[in-house]
Design a protein with these regions (language model features):
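Helix-coil boundary and interhelical linker segments in multi-pass alpha-helical membrane proteins
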Residues: 687-696, 760-772
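Membrane-water interface at loop-to-transmembrane-helix junctions
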Residues: 731-750, 770-775
Length: 873
C-alpha cells in the first residue's frame, strides 16, 4: 500500500473512513476503540527505593557487603559498621543524583497540545488534544500547535516550524500536492506532524495517526528501547573491583598458607587472613568517587553545564567523537541577513549604506512586503521575514515607522504555486506593488532592472549575472529572496495578473549563521584529539556550508544524506563513518545508527542536540548533551548534561573538566591503595618475623574514617590543569589498573610499609608490643597524610608552587595531624584507642619516620621521570 503522503487528499479521506465535514460521534467511538487515545504511552517508572537499591549493583560494593558480613561473623563489629555506613552514604548520594533521570516520556506528553479545533459532523468544536482520533478533521492557523499527524486537505499559504522534529531551521511551506516518490520526513510537504507549530497561513488536515503511532510517538518508542551505556569510569571501576578482589584473594591465600606452615590453627589462620583482606579493601573508594564527581557537578554548573547523571562528569573527559546537531547548537537558530546584491554588486549586511537610495529602498521594501513583527524583542512570524525586519533594526529603521509611512493598501499572500508574495503601497505619490519571491520565478516576470543610472530594460546578460550570484549564494548555504516592484494604477484591485512587467531591484541572502564561538570550540576539540561531526535534518548544501565555516568539513565529499545511510547495512555504516563529517536530511533512526556505528568502533560518543528528534540519539550516546535555552524538555530529559548557555564552547570546557576529574580520581585511588598496601606489608612483615600484629582493629577504623577519606576527597578537588587538552582521549577500554599505575602503587606502598615497620620495631624494642603498635599506628597515619602531597602529580612537586596549591589537602593534613597527635598524647584516650601515651621525644620520632616517606617517594618520582625522558629520546 502507498504511504499516506503518496495519496491524494480524497484517497486519504477514504482510507481513514472520513469526509471533509469530519466524523460523526459513532465514527469517533469506533476509531477510538481501534486506535486508542491521542497520548503517549508512559513507561514503567522506577521508585526511589528501586533506584536506591540499584546503587548496590557495583562489583566493589558487593565485595564490601560480603566483607561487612564476614567481619561481623568474626566479631569485628566496628569494621562491619564502618563498611555499612560508607556504602549506605554512597547509595544515598547516587540516588539523589539519578532520581530525575527518567522523565523523557513525561516531557514528550507535553507536546501533545492541550486543545485542538476539530470539525465533528460539520460543526467546529474545541476539544482536548487527547480526544482526537484517526479521521478527525482539524482546523489550523498561525500560532497553533499541531495536535496529531495528518494529511493536508485544505491549504491557504500554510507554513510550519518543524525544527524540533526534523532539524530543518526554516519554516516548511506546505502543499496539497501528492508526492509520488519516497521522501524523508522533512520533505513530506503535504503532511503535518504532532508537536510542530504553524507560523503562517491557515489550513485543514485529516488526522492519520494519533498517540504512539505519530512521529513523536515513534520517538517515544525509540527512547523506551534505547539502553543507557556504562560510562568509561563505571566500566573501569567494575574492572578495578574485580582485579582488586583477585589480588586480595591471592594475597589472603598466601598469608593463610604461611600461617598454617608456621603451625597456627587453621581456624585462626583463616580468620586472620580474612580480617586482613577486609582491611585491604578501600571501603571509602565508591563514596569518595561519588563525592568527587558531585563536587565536579557543582564546578561545572557554575560554568553553564548542569549534570543530570553523575557519571557523565567523568565520561565527558574520555569523549573521542562529538556528534552535534546543527540548528541551535552550532548555529544561532535565528535567520540572519548575510548579504545584499544590488546594481551588480555584492554587499555584506554589515556594510549596507542606508544613505544610498538603492540600498535604503531594498531595506524598506523588505520591511513592507513582510507580515512579521518584532515588538519588545518578541518575534512573531516566519523566521525569514523576521530576519528582514531585524536587519532594519540594526540600522535604526523600525518596521512600525516604515509601515506607517507607506501603508499597505492591498496584498497577494505567498503561496507555494506562485512562489511569491506581493503588497501594494502608496510611495512617492504613486501606487507601487512590491513583489518578493524565488529568484527563478521573478526573473521570468521581470523586463526591467534598476541601476545607478536609472531603470532600463533587463538583458539576458543581466539575468545570467543575477543567476550566477544566486547560485553562488546557494552554494554557500544561503537562502535567497529576489525583490522587484512596479507601478499600479490608482484604485486598482490587485490580482496575480499584475505580477509581471516587474523592475528587478536586488537579492537578499540569509542563513542561520554559526555561533561566534563555534569555530574556536571546534578547533579546540580537534587539538584535543576529538572528532567533531555534524548531524542534522537540514539540507546537505546548507549543512556543508556551515560545517566548512567552522572547520568541521573540508571537502563536500565528507558530507552525505540520510538516504545514503538507509541503503547501508550496519557493517557498511561502521566502515563509512570515519570518512564523513556531515550527515544531512537524517531521521531519528539514522542518528541512533550513526552513534552506534562510532561506538562499535570503540569510540566514546557525545551527542548534542535540542530537538525532539535528537532525544533517542542523546540517550543512545555515551554522553547526551542537550541545549538548555532552546532545547525541548524531551531533549533535556534524555540527556546526561544540559548546557544553560547553549554554547558549544561549554562542551569543550566540560571535556577539560572531565579529563581533570578522571586524573584526580586516579590520584585518590593511588592514595588509597598505596596506603592500604603499606599497612598490609607491615602486617605481613610482622607475621613473617613472628612478631605481634602491629595494629588493633580500632586503629584500622581510625585510618579508614580519617586518614583515608579526607585527603582522598581533597585530592579529588585538586586544581585543574589545562595541559590535559593537549593529550589525545584515552582509550575506552583503558583500565585504571595499568602496569605502570600498579607499579607506582606498589613502590609507594613499599616505602610507607617500610617506614611503618621501622616505627613498629623502634617502639617494640623500647617497651614491648603496645608501644610498638602505638609507633606503627602513628607512623602509618601521619605517613599517609604526608603521602597526600605525593599523590598530587605524577611528577615531583616538593619544590614547586603546586605543592601548596590545594587548600583542601592542606586542611585535611592539619586536621588529621592534630587528631592523631591528640590521640597519641592525651592520657585519657589511651584505653579507647589501645595506644601508649607518647612523650614529646617519642612523638617527634613518629613524625620523623612518617615525614621520611615524603622525600623518598619524591626522589623515586624524579628518578622515574628522568628514566622515562631517556627512553623517549
Amino acid at each position: 500500500m502507498k504511504e499516506i503522503y503518496q495519496q491524494t487528499a480524497e484517497e486519504v479521506l477514504e482510507r481513514v473512513k472520513s469526509r471533509e465535514s469530519g466524523l460523526t460521534d459513532e465514527q469517533v467511538r469506533r476509531s477510538r476503540e481501534k486506535c486508542g487515545w491521542n497520548e503517549l504511552a508512559e513507561g514503567k517508572k522506577k521508585s526511589i527505593l528501586q533506584i536506591f537499591f540499584e546503587q548496590y549493583k557495583d562489583f566493589l560494593v558487593l565485595i564490601l557487603i560480603a566483607s561487612a558480613v564476614i567481619s561481623g561473623m568474626l566479631g569485628d563489629v566496628e569494621s562491619a559498621a564502618v563498611i555499612v555506613i560508607v556504602i549506605t552514604i554512597n547509595a544515598i548520594l547516587g540516588t539523589v543524583q539519578t532520581v530525575k533521570a527518567e522523565q523523557s516520556l513525561q516531557s514528550l506528553k507535553k507536546l501533545s497540545g492541550p486543545e485542538a479545533k476539530v470539525l465533528r459532523d460539520g460543526v467546529a468544536v474545541q476539544l482536548p488534544a487527547r480526544e482526537l482520533v484517526v479521521g478527525d478533521v482539524i482546523l489550523l492557523e498561525a500560532g497553533d500547535m499541531i495536535p496529531a499527524d495528518g494529511r493536508l486537505i485544505e491549504n491557504a499559504s500554510l507554513k510550519v516550524d518543524e525544527s524540533a522534529l526534523t532539524g530543518e531551521s526554516l519554516a516548511v511551506e506546505k502543499s496539497m500536492d501528492t508526492i509520488l516518490e519516497e521522501a524523508p520526513l522533512g520533505d513530506r510537504t503535504n503532511m503535518l506532524f504532532s508537536g510542530s507549530f504553524v507560523t503562517y497561513g491557515r489550513g485543514r488536515a485529516v488526522v492519520t495517526n494519533v498517540g504512539m503511532q505519530t512521529e513523536v510517538g515513534k520517538i517515544a518508542g525509540l527512547l523506551k528501547s534505547t539502553s543507557e551505556k556504562q560510562t568509561p569510569l563505571q566500566a573501569n571501576l567494575d574492572d578495578f573491583g574485580k582485579k582488586l578482589s583477585i589480588l586480595i584473594l591471592i594475597f589472603c591465600g598466601i598469608l593463610f598458607a604461611i600461617s598454617v606452615f608456621r603451625g597456627e590453627k587453621i581456624s585462626s589462620a583463616f580468620m586472620f587472613a580474612v580480617a586482613l583482606a577486609v582491611a585491604a579493601i578501600p571501603e571509602a573508594l565508591s563514596s569518595i568517587v561519588t563525592i568527587v564527581l558531585s563536587f565536579g557537578t557543582q564546578k561545572m554548573a557554575k560554568e553553564h553545564a548542569i549534570i543530570r547523571k553523575l557519571q557523565a562528569v567523568e565520561g565527558l573527559g574520555s569523549v573521542s567523537v562529538i556528534c552535534s546537531d546543527k540548528t541551535g547548537t552550532l548555529t544561532q537558530n535565528k535567520m540572519t541577513v548575510e548579504d545584499y546584491y544590488i546594481d551588480g554588486k555584492r554587499i555584506t549586511a554589515d556594510a549596507i549604506d542606508v544613505a544610498d537610495p538603492a540600498q535604503r529602498c531594498l531595506l524598506d521594501y523588505s520591511i513592507l512586503c513582510n507580515d512579521s513583527t518584532n515588538e519588545n524583542g518578541v518575534e512573531i512570524g516566519d523566521p525569514t521575514e523576521t530576519a528582514l525586519i531585524n536587519l532594519g533594526s540594526r540600522y535604526g529603521i523600525e518596521a512600525a515607522g516604515v509601515r506607517k509611512l507607506y501603508q499597505r493598501e492591498g496584498e497577494l499572500p505567498f503561496d507555494s504555486d506562485r512562489k511569491m508574495m506581493s503588497t501594494l503601497h502608496r510611495i512617492d505619490d504613486e501606487n507601487r506593488m512590491i513583489v518578493k519571491g524565488a529568484v527563478d520565478r521573478l526573473l521570468e516576470l521581470t523586463d526591467r532592472i534598476w541601476t545607478k543610472d536609472g531603470v532600463r530594460e533587463i538583458t539576458e546578460a543581466d539575468k545570467e549575472k543575477i543567476q550566477r550570484q544566486n547560485q553562488e549564494f546557494s552554494m554557500e548555504g544561503l537562502r535567497v529572496l529576489a525583490f522587484t516592484y512596479r507601478e499600479i494604477p490608482e484604485k486598482h484591485v490587485l490580482t496575480t495578473e499584475d505580477e509581471n512587467h516587474l523592475v528587478f531591484l536586488g537579492l537578499i541572502a540569509m542563513m542561520d549563521p554559526p555561533r561566534e564561538e563555534s569555530k574556536a570550540a571546534v578547533a579546540e576539540c580537534i587539538k584535543a584529539g576529538i572528532r567533531p561531526v555534524m548531524i542534522t535534518g537540514d539540507h546537505k548544501i546548507t549543512a556543508a556550508a556551515i560545517a566548512k565555516r567552522i572547520g568541521i568539513l573540508h571537502d563536500l565529499s565528507e558530507a552525505c544524506e540520510g538516504a545514503d545511510i538507509e541503503n547501508m547495512s550496519d557493517e557498511q555504516l561502521r566502515e563509512f563513518v570515519p570518512n564523513i563529517s556531515v550527515y544531512a536530511r537524517v531521521s531519528p533512526e539514522h542518528k541512533i545508527r550513526i552513534v552506534r556505528a562510532w561506538q562499535e568502533k570503540g569510540m566514546i560518543v557525545a551527542m548534542t542536540g535540542d530537538g525532539v528528534n535528537d532525544a533517542p540519539a542523546l540517550k543512545q550516546a555515551d554522553i547526551g548533551v542537550a541545549m538548555g535555552v532552546t532545547g525541548t524538555e524531551v531533549a533535556k530529559d534524555a540527556a546526561a548534561m544540559v548546557l544553560t548557555d547553549d554554547n558549544f564552547a561549554t562542551i569543550v570546557k566540560a571535556v577539560e573538566n572531565g579529563r581533570n576529574l578522571y586524573q584526580n580520581i586516579k590520584y585518590a585511588i593511588q592514595f588509597l591503595l598505596s596506603g592500604n598496601f603499606g599497612a598490609i606489608l607491615a602486617v605481613l612483615c610482622a607475621s613473617l618475623a613472628g612478631l605481634p600484629v602491629p595494629f588493633a582493629p580500632v586503629h584500622l577504623l581510625f585510618i579508614n574514617l580519617l586518614t583515608d577519606s579526607l585527603p582522598a576527597i581533597a585530592l579529588g578537588v585538586e586544581p585543574h590543569s589545562s595541559e590535559v587538552m593537549n593529550e589525545k582521549p584515552r582509550s575506552a577500554d583503558e583500565s585504571i589498573l595499568t602496569k605502570d599505575f600498579l607499579g607506582k602503587i606498589g613502590l609507594e606502598g613499599l616505602v610507607i610499609g617500610m617506614m611503618t615497620m621501622i616505627g613498629f620495631l623502634t617502639g617494640y624494642h623500647q617497651n614491648g608490643a603496645l608501644l610498638g603498635s602505638t609507633y606503627a599506628f602513628g607512623t602509618l597515619c601521619l605517613a599517609r597524610l604526608f603521602h597526600g602531597f605525593n599523590c598530587k602529580s605524577d611528577h615531583p612537586v616538593i619544590f614547586t608552587k603546586r605543592f601548596f596549591n590545594n587548600k583542601w589537602l592542606q586542611g585535611a593534613f592539619v586536621l588529621g595531624a592534630v587528631l592523631i597527635t591528640v590521640v597519641l598524647t592525651v592520657p585519657g584516650l589511651h584505653l579507647l584507642f589501645k595506644v601508649e601515651t607518647l612523650d614529646l621525644m617519642q612523638l617527634g620520632c613518629v613524625y620523623l619516620y612518617a615525614f621520611a616517606s615524603l622525600p623518598i617517594i619524591q626522589l623515586l618520582k624524579w628518578i622515574r621521570m628522568k628514566l622515562k625522558k631517556r627512553e623517549e629520546k
